[in-house]
Amino acid sequence: MYYLSDLSHYAFFTYISVRAGFAFFIALCLSLFLMPKFITWAKAKNASQPIYEYAPETHKTKCHTPTMGGLIFISSAVIASLFCIKFDNIFAISALLCLILFCLIGLIDDLGKVLKKDNHSGLSPRMKLLAQIIAGLICILPLYFSSELSTELFIPFYKHPLFDMEIFAIVFWILVLISSSNAVNLTDGLDGLATVPSIFSLSTLGIFLYLSGNLNYSEYLLLPKIQGLGEVVIICAALIGALMGFLWYNCYPAQVFMGDSGSLALGGFIGFLAIISKNEILLLLIGFVFVLETVSVILQVGSFKIFNKRVFKMAPIHHHFEKVGWVENKIIVRFWMIALLSNLLALASIKLR
């Protein structure tokens, strides 16, 4: 679409905002169109993920709900992005690679569980970790060696870099990618619970990317200046559109789950956006719901191993609230509210520095 701008009547395609808008609506329409067809096919093939044996009783009714919906909304976002981005932009190409590779890891994991009807038949934790490290390196190393990406570490509400991580930045970035990917995966346990916070996080990071990629805005707001980041905003918009199409079928009561093919890809992509926009630390606030879910699991496992006692009735923490009697819809909406507030606070850091 960008290359149509060479024609005199299509010069407006040079604008990132225009191409982002097109990408959003293309992905939204693709997702809305393809998802019901996928649901019908998945039901016919009995492509549903087994329910965890210790899950709350209310989850037993979800045993026939199709999974792997992430494959559809990620594909929709990628197709829409390919129509709208510039192909000579290393940030955009690396971002698409991140989406595709982490989606493939999740898809392999999903297929193992679906085909054998066993939650433990997907990728082993060790194999999944290794695959995530390799995928992360494929996405990050080209940026590192091209010198397009700063290795300086920035913290929220402070305009200067804290220090230069140099070669250790690679290790730190891989840690961010893997942590973010798995955090969203842990959150995806209730209908729409991971979807809406992901939309909020993508929107916030998209704003940071747009501002940092614009030399005038970045200079005025004292943000890191990184030329070329604006193209990734188009992919953000496409993924938000695809997620909104998915949410139409994923909201309570869900007709389809995203599966690991969706959650691992979303988390990995959100982590990647935080890295290239220099918001690795602020990601703790941008993805606060994901952090909350992850910390609850760490506390639960750590407490049980050390003290032989559980902190929560069940982890991740959304299951704890189910166990104490909260209805699923109430948990979902309250977590959405927390995600919205945390992202508004993160956006406040743009001016407060």
Curated annotation (Swiss-Prot):
Belongs to the glycosyltransferase 4 family. MraY subfamily. Pfam families: Glycos_transf_4 (PF00953). The gene is mraY. It is a multi-pass membrane protein. Signal peptide: none annotated. It is found in: Cell inner membrane. Its EC number is 2.7.8.13. The chain crosses the membrane at residues 22-42, 65-85, 88-108, 129-149, 161-181, 192-212, 228-248, 256-276, 281-301, 330-350. Disulfide bonds: none annotated. The keyword Acyltransferase does not apply. Catalyzes the initial step of the lipid cycle reactions in the biosynthesis of the cell wall peptidoglycan: transfers peptidoglycan precursor phospho-MurNAc-pentapeptide from UDP-MurNAc-pentapeptide onto the lipid carrier undecaprenyl phosphate, yielding undecaprenyl-pyrophosphoryl-MurNAc-pentapeptide, known as lipid I. One of its GO terms (biological process) is cell wall organization. CDD domains: GT_MraY (cd06852). Keywords: Cell cycle, Cell division, Cell inner membrane, Cell membrane, Cell shape, Cell wall biogenesis/degradation, Magnesium, Membrane, Metal-binding, Peptidoglycan synthesis, Transferase, Transmembrane, Transmembrane helix. Pathway: Cell wall biogenesis; peptidoglycan biosynthesis. GO terms for molecular function: metal ion binding; phospho-N-acetylmuramoyl-pentapeptide-transferase activity; UDP-N-acetylmuramoyl-L-alanyl-D-glutamyl-meso-2,6-diaminopimelyl-D-alanyl-D-alanine:undecaprenyl-phosphate transferase activity. It comes from the Bacteria. InterPro entries: Glycosyl_transferase_4, PNAcMuramoyl-5peptid_Trfase, PNAcMuramoyl-5peptid_Trfase_CS. It comes from Campylobacter jejuni subsp. jejuni serotype O:6 (strain 81116 / NCTC 11828). Its cofactor is Mg(2+). It is an enzyme of class 2 (transferase). This is Phospho-N-acetylmuramoyl-pentapeptide-transferase. Its main location: membrane. It catalyses: UDP-N-acetyl-alpha-D-muramoyl-L-alanyl-gamma-D-glutamyl-meso-2,6-diaminopimeloyl-D-alanyl-D-alanine + di-trans,octa-cis-undecaprenyl phosphate = di-trans,octa-cis-undecaprenyl diphospho-N-acetyl-alpha-D-muramoyl-L-alanyl-D-glutamyl-meso-2,6-diaminopimeloyl-D-alanyl-D-alanine + UMP. The lineage of its organism: Bacteria, Pseudomonadati, Campylobacterota, Epsilonproteobacteria, Campylobacterales. GO terms for cellular component: plasma membrane. The keyword Transmembrane helix applies.
